[in-house]
Swiss-Prot record:
Tissue expression notes: Expressed by the venom gland.
Assigned protein family: Belongs to the neurotoxin 04 (omega-agtx) family. 03 (type II/III omega-agtx) subfamily.
UniProtKB keywords: Calcium channel impairing toxin, Disulfide bond, Ion channel impairing toxin, Knottin, Neurotoxin, Secreted, Toxin, Voltage-gated calcium channel impairing toxin
Stated name of the protein: U1-ctenitoxin-Pr1a
Amino acid sequence: SCINHGDACDGYKDDCQCCRRNGFCSCSGIFGYKWNCICDVGTTATSYGICMAK
């Protein structure tokens, strides 16, 4: 099962939890703590660890 775009995700897991191939778990955070995490869509311009294994 995967998490739809815009829904809450686990910021401590990898980005493959989000349904979209170019999706990633976008969080607010500081000093290793993460909160307000939702599945967002990245582009090639972002440096997020986008899951390409889908």
